[in-house]
Amino acid sequence: MTRFSAMLDACVLVPVTLADTLLRLAEASLYRPLWSARIITETVRAIKEVHPQLSADDIRNRADAMDAAFGDASVTGWEALEHVISLPDPDDCHVVAAAIVGRADLIVTSNVKDYPPDVLAPYHIEVQTPDVFLLNQLDLAPLAVMSALNRQARSSRKPQLTLDTLLDHLATCGTPDFARTAKTQKWRLAAEHQSSHILSSRHRDGL
């Protein structure tokens, strides 16, 4: 079965915490992530500007790790379509072109105004902010999303983040509604832990 696909614009891949969350949900098979070599180039350039303290190698390694983890994410062969697309900002046409070729269901971007619905409608592509996209994922698969967030918090280092602190960081990355809603769903993790503990006890007791 073909998975739901989302083209990730460079602006949602630059914030490290947000990008990590988006990719962890993809790793959990909640959707198929898409990008292009040009989007990655824009991401690398933007990260250098936002985080000048990071070395070029570290930034490039992050991009290479994304491609390695999601081997089918990078869309190719979109260049011929770029000049057919008409957008308020011509520099964004490559994103739509890659989304069309990659058969994306939607584009996740913080700049939704740059992608008019009437331009995307003929290609059956929607546009969503990362806040709306993550809220939808939480609604569709609440436990999977909360589990991914919990793993993300636990894997953080220097300092290690609590789940609440992680969600606070995400709120500053343009996903305030998602962060606020996710905080109300933490009970799912406790319920899952309790259920797993009960099952483990029964298995241990031979029940």
Show where each model-derived region lies:
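PIN/NYN-family metal-dependent endoribonuclease catalytic core
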Residues: 5-8, 16-52
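Amphipathic coiled-coil/heptad-repeat helices and related helical stalk/stem segments
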Residues: 18, 91-92
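A generic structural signal for alpha->beta connector loops
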Residues: 30, 71-72, 124
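PIN-domain endoribonuclease scaffold, especially VapC-family toxins
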Residues: 34-78, 146, 152-177
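Short, flexible loop segments at the rims of nucleotide/cofactor-binding pockets, characterized by
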Residues: 82-88
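Acidic, metal-binding active-site segment of PIN/NYN-like and related structure-specific nucleases
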Residues: 92-125
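Acidic, PIN/NYN-like endoribonuclease modules and their adjacent C-terminal/linker elements
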Residues: 113-203
